Amino acid sequence: MAKSKVFKNCLALLLITLVAGFALAVVNEITAKPISEAENKAKMAAYESVFSGVEFEEINSSDKLIKAENDSAPVQNASVDDVLRAVDKNGNTVGYVMSATSASGYGGDVKIAIGISVADDKITGFKVLSHSETAGLGAKCTEDDFQNQFAGKSAGKLSYVKNAAASDSEID
């Protein structure tokens, strides 16, 4: 008698698990595409905020470009995730927009988008896409005062200073 009760309980548990797993798979299938579209729309809105008035084109060899950027990047624990070409109405390349992820955030990964103009090698915009920083000081990275200070700065190496920025390569 005890063996049949254990078998019945195992069978019931198996049936419940199969139904729950199937339900989760169906929900995932239904929601995967809308979630992906919403994420892509948010990413493109961020790209437009860091380089406005242009259209974006995929770069044919972007995988090679991203690998080269990651191999030569002077920043540790960071990687370039995406690179798009910014083109004007005439199809001329006016800059690039890229997203990158740094694993050096205090609370985890920090993902950013940045636009760079090829005409003057200046940053056209900067936006934090996602972060897990602590409320207070770390989360201030999403405030306009912080993000807007990058626009117009040299796309080369930037230095963080405690006092007011005195040169094109400093942020405060």
Question: Where do the language-model regions lie?
Answer:
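Flexible, solvent-exposed loop/hinge segments and secondary-structure transition points
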Residues: 1-172
